Amino acid sequence: METRTNEYSRKGAMWELERNLDQPMDAEAGRLRNMYREKTYPTILLLRLAFQSLGVVFGDLGTSPLYVFYNIFPHGIEDTEQVIGALSLIIYSLTLIPLVKYVFIVLRANDNGQGGTFALYSLLCRHAKINIIPNQHRTDQDLTTYSRRTYEEKSLAAKIQRWLEGHQFRKNLILILVLFGTCMAVGDGILTPAISVLSATGGIQVEEGRMRNDVVVIISVLILIGLFSMQHYGTDKVSWLFAPIVFVWFILIGILGAVNICKYDHSVLKAFNPVYVYRYFKRGKTSWTSLGGIMLSITGTEALFADLSYFPVQAIQIAFTVVVFPCLLLQYTGQAAFIAANTNQVSHAFYISLPAPILWPAFAVATAAAIVASQATISATYSIIKQALALGCFPRVKIIHTSKKYLGQIYSPDINWILMVFCIAVTAGFKNQSQIANAYGTAVIMVMLVTTFLMIPIMLLVWRSHWTLVVAFTVLSLLVEIPYFSAVVRKIDQGGWVPLVFAAGFMIIMYVWHYGTLKRYEFEMHSKVSMAWILGLGPSLGLVRVPGIGLVYTELASGVPHIFSHFITNLPAIHSTLVFVCVKYLPVYTVPPDERFLVKRIGPKNFHMFRCVARYGYKDIHKKDDDFEKMLFDSLILFVRLESMMEEYSDSDEYSTLMMSLPNNPGISNGGVTTTGTNNVMEVMSCTSTHDSIVPVNSRSDDTGSSQVMPASGQMAFQSVGDEIAFLNACRDAGVVHILGNTVIRARRDSGFVKKIVINYMYAFLRKICRENSAIFNVPHESMLNVGQVFYV
């Protein structure tokens, strides 16, 4: 007991005061939450959604037959058994990866209907403390969309959780893995339009044999320019065409495949016997290197998961098993039958096998399907960048809603033009399918491997699967993916280097931005203003309180930011009502509007200071018509009403009770304010103190229209909650000013060379070219105030 008393005396009463005052948002600041219920769909609606998913999810996978066999046998075919072996590999690759792994397993690992790499990462962040967002709090777990499980102490899941949380290196490793997969997915968004459009337009050469390849490239580039130039219009007006186009495409290739099987060589059906896979590999090194071409048959599989947000899992499962999978098997088998009978016509085998009367209609449908596939990939890239931005891993770029009906349809002009430039560069630079296919295969297999590795902790932590099932899934996936990976690695010098360069560039940007953002947050956290110092200034904060509301933006979810002390040090006045606004993103896909804002009072009521935390998910967007300011003010009024109804103590009562319980400790100094004892602090905090010469104003204007600052011998005390609400409304009518920090981050002089390069040049450059916070929050320029500071980290 004596030891505890000595320890308490050593730390001081002011330390205890600071510890109790500087608390994050507590559970009382939130709202009662609605229970989240998973949607159920009637059979008719589910079938309709399954049909619509064809146009969004399966376009990339469906256009693969245009270029697969040419990339398997770029140097010709030796015999028919070689074709049967390749077909057997295609059949079982389609069965094991898209059907078994993705449709029936990975799709279940969705984050309340959201898919993709960041969705998996968000699930992990909620079940283990590995997330990269530092300003999180336990109250965030009360959200209806923040679903997580608890574990028994000795369970395997609990051990895995402790292992992941046990070292910063493991957290960083998972982050790097996620960022790498994200960067490869962005590379996929560059390469898919290039190879899909180039392969589709290549059909012209079948009819016009003397047409040079350069002409095909020019036509492809023009189509790509048109595709990217139309992105800002959105797909809402034409998306209803996507599903019929892709459906017609699948029916076309399915029927054509069945006809070719009957017409040319039905012996290729032997490929369904897996023994031909073994025989194919016995042929030597050539068969192994051809795996890069075979792998193209499963490109677009990741879109099954990445585009999950648009459709329920059951709809995608129905569409794949009923339409996509059978039609692809028929087409690949029929194309193999044609090639087996015409071994010298591998190039453009799809178009050559077509009956002459339907060549041009098929060419039109193929080109339309390629454009639809490209559009789906481009849209997915926008979503990926948006998720990375929300999790603090990408510089702020402009995000625009292109549809009032579908919130998921977004457009980023900055990313759009970057994608277009790179896509055209790849198309015009390589000029042929082979090298682009090698690059494409590298990007796809990397994303698949990342998904496999992330699924391991998902199955253990989220699903609590038995370890034998986890091992079976991992072995089954790697059994297919590792051979493909080894094949594409051998072709790095033949175009496979392209996605690696793209990934390296985006990886550097993402990690530098995340590192700089984290360092800036750590500096703000360590240099935040002492709450005891703020309270020691009195209700007027030592300044003139003028009518109006000041919204001070900060990344801190608790405490008063350093920007505020910098502000009041350099200006003689401050607004009569202050709200510290923290806009933060959580590892959830969305935050319901009625749970978005948390409000808490700072200090006694007569300080008129509040903290408001606005929470968003990685799918949520600050829209211009959201009226963020109005929603924040409504939440503030609601908090005041609820506070008056609560039976518990108000914050000021809690503070007074706390101070009465503290022992006297004269000579405490904190935050530059020296007191002679706790009684003085109590006087500052008490609502009946009479030591302030300037009090919060009544913001009514006089007859001349000028606002007055009213001195008084006592502090303003509200007789009822109606008085405080009237005061807040009057402050709002007087004007709202948004106070943002315009900070410059510099590395300390004693920092290492690499850190100086990263912070002083790379991060500084990214901050210079990215969008300002004021633009992201849609803050009007006439009511914005920037406070400049230099942070040395």
From Swiss-Prot:
Q: Which residues are exposed on the Cytoplasmic face of the membrane?
A: 1-53, 108-172, 236-237, 309, 373-409, 464-468, 516-793
Q: What does the UniProt record say this protein does?
A: High-affinity potassium transporter.
Q: Which residues are glycosylated?
A: 432
- Intracellular or extracellular location(s): Membrane
> Cellular component terms, GO, for this chain's entry?
membrane
Report keywords, A-Z.
Glycoprotein, Ion transport, Membrane, Potassium, Potassium transport, Transmembrane, Transmembrane helix, Transport
User: Which GO biological process annotations does it have?
Assistant: potassium ion transport
Q: How does it sit in the membrane?
A: Multi-pass membrane protein
Which segments sit on the Extracellular face? Answer: 75-86, 194-214, 259-287, 331-351, 431-442, 490-494
Q: Which family does it belong to?
A: Belongs to the HAK/KUP transporter (TC 2.A.72.3) family.
Q: Which residues cross the membrane?
A: 54-74, 87-107, 173-193, 215-235, 238-258, 288-308, 310-330, 352-372, 410-430, 443-463, 469-489, 495-515
- Provenance organism: Oryza sativa subsp. japonica
NCBIfam families this protein is in? kup
Record's InterPro entries?
K+_transporter (IPR003855), K_trans_C (IPR053952), K_trans_N (IPR053951)
| Location (main, coarse) | membrane
What is the protein's given name?
Potassium transporter 18
One MF term from GO for this chain? potassium ion transmembrane transporter activity
